[in-house]
Amino acid sequence: MIKRHSILTAILLCFVAFTQVMAQEMQEPEPLPIDPKVRYGKLSNGLTYYIRHNDQPKDRADFYIAQNVGSILEEENQRGLAHFLEHMAFDGSRNFPNNGMDEYIESVGMRSGENFNAYTSFDETVYMITNAPVNKSGVVDSCLLILHDWSGFLALTDSAIQKERGVIREEWRTRQDAQTRLWEQQLPKMYPGSRYANRMPIGSIDVIENFKPDELRAYYKKWYRPDLQAIIIVGDVNVDQVEATIKKMFADVPAPVNPAKREQVSVPDNDLPLISIAKDKEASNTILYIFYKHDKLPNDLNRTIAGLVKDYIQQICASIMDERFDDILHQANPPFIYAQAYDDDNFMIAKSKGAWTVAALAKEGEIDSTLTTLVKETQRVKQYGFTPSEYERARINVLKQYESAYNERNNQKNDAYVREYVNHFTNGGYIPGIEMEYTLLNQIAQNIPVEQVNQYIQDMIGEDNIVIGLTGPDKEGIKYPTEENLLRTFLKARQMPVEPYKETVSNEPLVPTLPTPGQITETKTGQPFGATVFTLSNGIKVVLKPTEFKKDEIIMTATSPGGSTLFGTKDIDNLKVFNDVIEIGGLGNFSATDLSKRLAGKKVSCALSLSQDSENVNGMAAPSDLRTLFELIYLSFTAPRMDEEAYASFETRTKAQLQNMELNPMVAFSDSLSKAVYGDNPRASRLRPQDFEHISYPRIMEMRKERFSDASGFVFTFVGNIQIDSIRPYIEQYLATLPSQGKIEKGNPAEVPSTRKGDYMNRFNRSMEIPKVTVANLYTGQMEYNLENIITCLLYTSDAADDTPCV
């Protein structure tokens, strides 16, 4: 018997508990108000609009039109028309014939594809103009005019449609990657009886090549209409003027007469688990999913405080499950490479159904053990719930996230608001603003006990409405269970006895014994960029640069000359995993998992790394957690911790993940590219499973000691919301006491992999499921190493296809 209303029951019980504790009268909850900083309205023709002034960044704005229309609305003979129509929106309109839109966008300094784009998904189509220079004359009105034409005035000429068929055909071909082909196998099994089974946005190539132009125009007229559209403008604009322009400009968009009803496409319930197994020759990972489907909270409740309660509980449940999976990952031979749990209010691609989801990256040949572990951990929660200590950590972590968002409320970029408003229009929910959300979340977190959280998650983990998905490489020698065997394993695991979750959490100080503080021996103010520079009694230099960009963040970097080039060829394989391994054991008296739990509720991080020519420490903290950052820095230099079991887990998982990397054609391309550029230099080769035969964890920890036990030569830089008088005691206590022998080193340039000289061409063929060609052109030359060239190079590479640094 399928429990169709379990989520509604669970949420209402939590809501009742919350309101009773808050001593409120139980009545129909009111929708949360719209953020007063958002100008929200609806025209008489049904068009919705959101306008918000935001000067982060100054003189720039984003212009979006969201269509509550996607590929899910296509009939069988229309598959692909939603995406095709998206392309046609850039091929001429009433006010921008032919390539007029592209020409205008480029005339004001924007670029098509980067600032001028769109996407089509199953349930929505969204068009965007981003980072528009609204300080230039006429840009606001012109961008609104483009949105106006997108709304209902596309040209859709026969010639443009015919020309675009070839473009779409090529996009269809190039996007037929392993993930797409896996989905095409999976969706019919996961969504039987639903349109979601066969409505991939790219569509059917047969439809693309053969539909009649009038069919596209009919689809456009049927679905592109103001009652299914929202205009979203966020940026450095005059809200009153923009609203007035919208009301005037969009008044000629006709309201639909007898419009087709935009219904949510349903996903049928199922008594027995549905099984989907998909393989592909170019897939490189084995991934296992278990979906526990459930009905969604109705939108009239989701836009009230009940929706906020639901979202809070979902975050709590996912956080605790991920923490449990992380504990398992640190076992010597974990049953999976990685695992996570989540509930994002969707059942994979379907918006009409929710799903509590657990997923894992499985090791080759160990699908049964992965599935068994996922089921047992789920049943552990089903039977016993979460512990009070787990809930407390998750609770303060969630509150910290909201606190950080609240503290940074005046520094949000345009795209953060745009995403929120697009989601509000297409999915419903609430947008009261972070001020109200933060206030309400604090009340919710204080008044919902762990028992109510447990009741919610236990209701979500049902006995029916279950879907199991498995994807992996189609490779000789890899055996997969049949659907029957996978179901048998699932049902067997569900009957296995489980015990309540047990944990030990240490509350001891991070640094149990503090040394006598050192001193600041020299202070220089008025330095470049307005910085203050301290020289400490152990020779370390500290640079402080207060800024007001973010109120809730201080960023720390520390570097010292040296780096990986100081190690010889015998350590090359160790260097390949050095940065991944040196901190898996934790710090001081805390394992990595215990340290993570100890830092619950804190916005802080600190990590060591080794580059070719330097040792590096990177960290960040909220001002309230600054002391913790200094404690982590101190421990990183003075109290590294080895954990053989954690390393064994890392080796097992990494080897399993690397095992089928070569099946991905782009990995083969990357390997060939590296060899073309650097020849056979072993320092430029990627990690392979066989490299672990030469990797030694004890040796890596010795290497860490060589590079990080002596802080000589390190320069620490702190940038952010810094109060210099407040940070001084931490500097004296934790940095001025770091061991320092006064030894200053430099990297070894001779060991840096050099690029091939002269002209060189490497062509190679690779069998692919869908043949395509990839080309990379690289140019090398000499450049003076100075600040101007470094910044120029960073600006250049920020627009490149990758993030390759300038060296």
Describe the predicted segments one by one.
Residues Y50-R52, P57-E74, L81-A82, N99-D149, ...:
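M16 family metallopeptidases and their MPP-like homologs
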Residues R79-H87:
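Histidine-centered catalytic micro-motifs
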